[in-house]
A protein has these predicted regions:
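Hydrophobic alpha-helical connector segments
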Residues: 68-96, 152
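Amphipathic alpha-helical packing segments from all-alpha helical-bundle domains
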Residues: 92-105, 113-139, 149-153, 187-188
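Hydrophobic/aromatic-rich alpha-helical bundle segments in the mid-to-C-terminal region
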Residues: 137-185, 193-198
Length: 198
C-alpha cells in the first residue's frame, strides 16, 4: 500500500504526463483513473482541479530544481548580474516546460483551473523580474524614466513563453542566441545608457 506522499507524487507525475501529452482526458475523474485511485481519493489530496494543476506546476519546478537554477541570480553581486542570471535561468527553463505550458495556455480560455495554474506560474516569473529590476534600481542603473512597475512589465513581457516560441521555434534561433539577445534587449530597455556592463 502506498503512503500518502507516494500517492501525491504519483498523482502529480500522472497529471504532468497528461498535460505534456496534451490529452483531453484531464478531468479529475480521468486523472484518478490514470493514477489507479478513486475520484474521491484524488479529492482528498486535491479538493479542486485548480489546486491539482497548481501543485503539478510546483512539482515540476521542484523536480527540475528551479530554486537551484535561480541561486546565481539571487546571490548576484549587482543588479546587472542578477538580470543576466535571471534571464538565463528563466529562458533556459522554457524549453523544458514548453509542453506543459502549451497545454495550460490552450485550456485556459475555457478552463478556469488551467487559467489559474498558468497565471500563478506567470506571477512567479513576474516576481523574479521585479526582484531583478529592484536590484538594478538599487544600483542606480535603472533608466530614470522607468518606474519599477513599468520596468518589471517590460522584462516580464520579454521573457514570455510566446516570445521564446516565436524566436526559437518559428525563427529557428538557437537557445544560446535567444538567451544572449534577451539579455541585450533587456539591457537596452532597462538600463541607463552606458551602464550596461559597469
Amino acid at each position: 500500500m502506498m503512503s500518502s506522499e507516494q500517492t501525491k507524487t504519483r498523482i502529480l507525475e500522472t497529471t504532468w504526463k497528461v498535460l505534456e501529452t496534451r490529452s483531453d482526458k484531464n478531468r479529475m475523474s480521468d486523472i484518478a483513473t490514470a493514477v489507479g485511485i478513486s475520484r474521491q481519493a484524488l479529492y482528498l489530496h486535491y479538493p479542486t482541479r485548480a489546486e491539482l494543476l497548481i501543485a503539478t506546476t510546483k512539482h515540476i519546478d521542484k523536480v527540475k530544481k528551479v530554486n537551484q537554477r535561480l541561486e546565481l541570480s539571487r546571490a548576484a553581486g549587482s543588479g546587472i548580474e542578477r538580470l543576466h542570471f535571471f534571464i538565463k535561468a528563466c529562458g533556459g527553463y522554457i524549453p523544458e516546460i514548453h509542453g506543459m505550458s502549451v497545454a495550460l495556455r490552450n485550456m485556459r480560455e475555457n478552463d478556469k483551473a488551467a487559467a489559474e495554474a498558468w497565471d500563478e506560474r506567470m506571477q512567479a516569473v513576474r516576481h523574479g523580474c521585479q526582484a531583478a529590476v529592484r536590484a538594478i534600481e538599487k544600483d542606480g542603473k535603472l533608466k530614470s524614466d522607468l518606474s519599477e512597475q513599468v520596468a518589471t512589465d517590460i522584462l516580464w513581457t520579454l521573457l514570455t513563453v510566446e516570445n521564446w516560441e516565436r524566436l526559437v521555434l518559428d525563427c529557428t534561433w538557437s537557445q544560446s542566441e535567444y538567451e544572449i539577445k534577451m539579455i541585450e534587449l533587456a539591457e537596452i530597455a532597462l538600463l541607463e545608457s552606458g551602464k550596461a556592463r559597469n
